Amino acid sequence: MKTEKPKQFIHWCILGAVGCGFMAAGDWLLGCIPLQETDTGLFNRAYYLSGSYGLWKPVLTVGLGAIGGFLYYFVVKALNADIDAKCQKTKTIQFLCGIFTVAIALTIHTWVATMAWFATYLGPRIGVEAAIAAVTAYQDDMLPAILPLYLPKFCLQAGLAGGELI
């Protein structure tokens, strides 16, 4: 390891691992729901559409994702600290890819939690079919909006893989 401060490196890794735990807890809140035979897709689930899923859970999911994303940043710092200083372009690419990963994770947490909230809120109020249509339309509209977040990361990684940036 090339880092001058191994205790700080370990500290950053621990903070990043805790951040991953927060993000996993948010995912667990969304994923651990009772399933029915009629459930299909991510949000066409009776538990959401009946209003049984607590409206506070998607809000907590976003909060856990935000805290997790913030703490995961320390893993990005730890990985960056281990790259030799003479490889400055590589360090920059790795750092930017790490930041884009955190931004994408937080965006996806927010997006998925919002759809769960919409399904839970709208299901009992406007009916199951209308709620499914609304959530599906939201999902279809948001996916193209999220995809550009991946472009800088792919471009940076493609440049790094090409060898010119090392």
Locations of the language-model features?
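Hydrophobic, aromatic-enriched alpha-helical segments typical of multi-pass transmembrane helices
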Residues: 2-166
